[in-house]
Amino acid sequence: GMTAEEIEKYINQIAFSSAEEFLEKYKDDKAAIIGHFGLGFYSSFMVSKKVEIVTKSYKEGAVPMKWSCDGSPEYTLEETEKADRGTDIILYIDDENRDFLNKDKINGLLTKYCKFLPVPIAFGKKQEWKDGKYVDTAEDNVINDVLPAWVRKPADLKDEDYKKFYRDL
């Protein structure tokens, strides 16, 4: 999670320094902005009419904060309620991008782009076949391998590990 000061530093200062010139430069080709420094998070505005960050730092006495922006250089930053430390990013998807809310589309994108990230990425719950249909279990459905073959010692790998890695590519 972040403090209000960290939000100001990492979200606002980096984001909005030269933001107006940046937006003017890419106004006709939104897709051209992907990959530019600091725009991983800011690409969320390509599909959203509004983005909120609800966050609480691990630091002693941290106050939960909510940052909200509609994609313009204007934003709000206010105290909020959040029991646990960490950060939630909430996207309010615009009408023309509602297909990104489709479960299969999300799963496909996460699998394609997050398959080998070093932290677990959970999407939904694992399912099991029960009474003629699939039902969710209590276990998170982790879509990535946090210890892929290339980070493990060759002596620790079995033939099946290599085959799984090849299939995952």
Question: What function would you assign to each model-found segment?
Answer:
Residues 33, 51-74, 95-97, 104-169:
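GHKL/Bergerat-fold ATPase module in large chromosome/replication-associated machines
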